[in-house]
UniProtKB/Swiss-Prot annotation:
One of its GO terms (biological process) is cell wall organization. The gene is slg1. S-layer protein. The S-layer is a paracrystalline mono-layered assembly of proteins which coat the surface of the cell. In H.hispanica, the S-layer contains two different glycoproteins, Slg1 and Slg2, which share highly similar amino acid sequences. It holds the Pfam family PGF-CTERM. This is Cell surface glycoprotein 1. Belongs to the halobacterial S-layer protein family. A motif (PGF sorting signal) lies at residues 895-897. It comes from Haloarcula hispanica (strain ATCC 33960 / DSM 4426 / JCM 8911 / NBRC 102182 / NCIMB 2187 / VKM B-1755). InterPro entries: DUF7827, PGF_CTERM, Slg1/2_DUF7282, Surf_glycop_sig_pep.
Length: 918
């Protein structure tokens, strides 16, 4: 018994020793914290320049303004951020230090505070990177709603000013969404009356309720500032650039007028450069950081809105070391015609700049030079050389660059000069070209050489086209070729009041038109063409050359004997003329509205008469050529007319059914929209039907109308109305409604070997055929019957064009024999019988069956011995055994819990030992 007691005593003493070790550890930890210097638990700037430091203990002595140093973005005590006062209550001795600055700190600034002269320790406390808030909410103010942008840092103050709700470390702050769901729940830091709240994780467009100490005091509505930082090729050179390119970003936001701070960071997150610009609402603002070294790549740009502190970052921008720049021609030989604008494409690599030279002062007695800049960064610059103005006008009229690229420092020289545009242009022939990367005008060793070949110009052809009177052709009509076959048809007979389009195929015109449009007073291609081309009536027969040498006259030739020519006066017909140019194909379309043209004698085209016209385009002897080049086209304008198609009895016949067609033909331009008016002469069946029709390319038109609601035997009149829908220009014809052709058909489900189907019955009022469609009424026609006479038919066998090898749906459809040849000619002729506007049909499933083949019985029978081994798979009934969860021992954390476990284990061991001894 004594041994037992001694064992218990020893175990108990051991337990006390173990417990004392843990207890000592706990006591030592607390003692170490208590012995530390005073430190900052939380720091915040709020309420227009007020700073709070929540400390973990008293400063030991009152903090004065002279004890505080302010660092803004690393600058110590800037003059406009001085400490104006220290709160008399919260002076540090209470564990809270509050003081005011001369100026509010913007949320994008870095704020650090150093407090010196404290009692004990190292006498100093430092708060770095203090939370600078953009707005302050008073928990006891009940001021209502606060609007904030997502990403702002807000200060929620509970300082007991009115409701005695001074915050403590147990004061709860709760933020709930509009549905009452808690999104944030926290407590104030000890010795702090300010809770800093980040709105980054809140949803835009939502309203949130803020409660402090159980009271709902404030609502916050979250909006989106939409601060975007984009890498844009239009403002810089993109996301993958070299050290010669420009690193720039576009910044936009929904709210403008406020400054923003853009900082460029390198791969080590070190600041490289900073810019401040005022943002514009929904407009891009460019932050340009110029050229950057490849050594610190990649870079990114962080932009912070100064007022709210909301930030956004760009994607990564990679900068590589640039290679030596090089320039070349896309094609080493470029050719065009004298008077045209030559497009020369220069390609640049590892550079934005290049210098181009065209011609040689010694060999050609002419040269022009320009400095190119690839502003859009696509590696190409298209140079336009106007051979019409070369050697005469200012340099900029000769060399130009379209689009976003640029050309500067143009210099033209050589012995070749022109006093005016009436002087001779450059001679046809080959001219040297070269291009060199860089900006130096002194080129001794060009990167690439090439040849510009200028050929003689010519007038190849002029032909006429007809377009509807309302064709609305304009000078930006880039799709004029798409009109061909729709509302533009080649013709030398044009209906009066329609538009006649003169297609001129000629080279050497482009330069004169571009000069008038770019450097003259012309606002569009039409004005440029009229300005560059002599169309003056009284000078048409003048043998003297005009300034440009270009001439167009349209002369009336049917004026009779002993009469002067009567040309169109384009100067008084400007509203009637539209020009569409296609210089790439040396083609120019001059559209003239025949309803508006005025002749030299002041008269217009009489629409009731035929007028014969001769259009001639020429390049006269002058600056562009030494010889006259021309071509002419003769055409006639005729009275507008339309003729309706009649049956053998001289009337327009339609059936009392839907989808009835009335046809005719006209001389107005294809594509014109006409109307066919059909008006009843019966009081019992009154109607007026006006379907619209489009004139086809062959001059025909087809009007479709529904007569199924009107009785057979009704008479009506029919006439064609012009484009305006009022004036009729066809004779009024008689029309009659007759009985509609009718048909019925029936087919049943059946089995077939796939070669034929059987239609149960059909009734055809005018005879015809039964066609079989596969699948549905619009499916392929797979077979048709022989001709069936008018009347009823039963058990009609239709042989299929190709045998069917699988089941299908057969759709039986009666067709007419519209051309009377008793042969099935659909499509084209032999339309289906219809009812209510739809084809008459019936359908049934056809099952494909194969003929049974009888095979001779196999006389040899193989008998397999029974398998003596039987494998049985016995599915035993599933028994649900309880799964054994292997318990996982989780180490408890905390010194108190560990000590208790150890003590319990020792006591249990002691009791077990006693039991064994007993």
């Amino acid at each position: 018994m004594t041994d037992t007691n001694e064992k218990i005593r020893s175990l108990f003493l051991t337990a006390l020793m173990v417990f004392s070790v843990f207890a000592g550890t706990i006591a030592f930890s607390g003692g170490a914290a208590a012995a530390a210097n005073v430190s900052v638990q939380q720091a915040a700037e709020y309420d227009s320049g007020t700073v709070e430091l929540a400390l973990n203990g008293s400063t030991g002595s009152t903090v004065n303004t002279g004890d505080i140093d302010i660092y803004v973005d690393g600058n110590k005590n800037p003059s406009n951020y001085g400490v104006s006062s220290v709160d008399t209550t919260d002076d540090g001795t209470t564990g809270r230090l509050q003081f005011s600055l001369d100026q509010d700190v913007q949320p994008n600034r870095n704020l650090t505070v150093k407090v010196s002269g404290l009692t004990g320790g190292d006498n100093t406390v430092v708060a770095e990177d203090i939370d600078v808030t953009s707005q302050t909410i008073d928990a006891d103010d009940d001021s209502g709603d606060t609007n904030a942008f997502r990403g702002e840092v807000l200060a929620i103050r509970a300082d007991g000013d009115t409701d005695n709700d001074d915050a403590t470390s147990s004061t709860k702050i709760v933020v709930e969404d509009s549905n009452g769901a808690v999104v944030t729940q926290d407590t104030y830091t000890a010795n702090s009356k300010v809770y800093t709240y980040e709105t980054e994780n809140l949803d835009t467009g939502e309203e949130y309720e803020v409660s402090v100490a159980g009271d709902a005091d404030e609502n916050i509505t979250i909006s989106n500032l939409d601060l975007n930082v984009n890498i844009d090729d239009d403002v810089g050179d993109g996301a993958n650039i070299d050290d010669k390119d420009t690193l720039a970003v576009n910044v936009s936001t929904t709210r403008g007028g406020e400054p923003a701070n853009a900082t460029l960071f390198n791969e080590d997150d070190d600041k490289v450069a900073t810019q401040v610009e005022s943002l514009k609402g929904n407009e891009n603002v460019v932050f340009d950081f110029g050229n950057q070294s490849a050594d610190d790549s990649p870079y990114y740009v962080k932009v912070t809105d100064n007022q709210t502190g909301v930030s956004a970052e760009s994607d990564q921008i990679n900068v590589s070391e640039s290679d030596d720049g090089e320039a070349s021609f896309e094609s080493s030989t470029v050719q065009d015609n004298i008077g045209d604008v030559v497009n020369i494409t220069v390609q640049v690599d590892n550079t934005e700049d290049a210098v181009i030279n065209i011609g040689d002062e010694n060999d050609d007695n002419y040269y022009i030079q320009g400095q190119l800049e690839d502003d859009n960064g696509d590696g190409e610059v298209t140079v336009q050389f106007n051979s019409y103005t070369a050697g005469n006008y200012s340099d900029s009229t000769v060399l130009s660059v379209p689009g976003d690229d640029d050309i500067d420092n143009i210099k033209e020289g050589g012995d070749y000069t022109r006093g005016s545009l009436s002087g001779d242009t450059l001679e046809a022939g080959s001219y040297s070209m070269n291009v060199t990367a860089g900006t130096s005008p002194d080129v001794t060793s060009p990167d690439t050489v090439g040849t510009l070949r200028l050929n003689e110009n010519s007038v190849e052809n002029i032909q006429t086209w007809a377009a509807p009177s309302d064709a609305d052709i304009d000078d930006d009509d880039v799709d004029i070729y798409d009109r061909i076959g729709e509302n533009l048809t080649q013709s030398d007979d044009v209906a009066a009041e329609d538009v006649v389009v003169h297609e001129i195929q000629a080279s050497g015109i482009e330069g004169a038109l571009e000069y008038e449009q770019e450097d003259g007073s012309a606002s569009d291609v039409t004005e440029a063409f009229i300005a560059a081309t002599d169309t003056t009536p009284y000078r048409i027969n003048d043998s003297d050359a005009t300034t440009s040498g270009l001439r167009l006259y349209v002369n009336r030739t049917d004026v009779g004997a002993n009469a002067d020519a009567n040309p169109i006066d384009f100067s008084n017909s400007s509203d009637a003329v539209t020009v569409v140019d296609d210089p790439d194909n040396n083609t120019y379309f001059v559209a003239v509205d025949t309803s508006d043209v005025v002749f030299e004698n002041g008269k217009t085209i009489v629409k009731e008469e035929d007028t014969r016209l001769n259009a001639t385009f020429s390049v006269r002897e002058g600056p562009l050529t030494d010889d006259r080049n021309s071509d002419s086209a003769i055409y006639t304008t005729s009275e507008r007319d339309a003729t309706l198609d009649l049956d053998d009895s001289g009337v327009v016949t339609v059936s009392a059914a839907a989808g009835q067609e009335v046809t005719g033909e006209t001389n107005v331009a294809p594509g014109s929209e006409l109307e066919v008016e059909m008006e009843s002469e019966s009081d019992a069946n009154p109607f007026v039907i006006r379907p619209e029709v489009d004139v086809a390319t062959d001059g025909t038109y087809t009007a479709t109308a529904d007569f199924q609601d009107y009785s057979a035997g009704t008479n009506f009149t029919v006439q064609t109305l012009d484009v305006d829908g009022d004036s009729d220009f066809s004779d009024e014809e008689d029309g009659r409604i007759v009985e509609a052709d009718t048909a019925t058909v029936s087919i049943s489900e059946q089995e077939s070997d796939g070669s034929e189907v059987v239609v149960d019955s059909a009734q055809l009022s005018e005879g015809g055929f039964i066609a079989i469609h596969a699948g549905n009424a619009s499916g392929d026609v797979v077979g048709n019957s022989e001709y069936l006479g008018a009347g009823s038919h039963e058990d009609i066998t239709v042989t299929l064009d190709e045998p069917m090898d699988e089941d299908f749906t057969a759709v039986a459809m009666p067709h007419q024999d519209t051309n009377g040849n008793e042969a099935y000619d659909f499509p084209g002729d032999d339309d289906p019988y219809t009812q209510n506007g739809s084809a008459v049909t019936d359908s049934a499933n056809v099952t494909i069956v194969e003929e049974e083949q009888t095979e001779a019985p196999d006389t040899e029978t193989e008998t397999e011995a029974p398998d003596t081994e039987t494998e049985e798979e016995t599915d035993a009934p599933a028994t649900d055994e309880p799964a054994t969860d292997e318990s996982e021992t989780t180490a408890a954390e905390g010194p108190g819990f560990t000590a208790a476990i150890a003590l319990i284990a020792l006591v249990a061991a002691a009791l077990l030992a006693v039991r064994r001894d007993n």
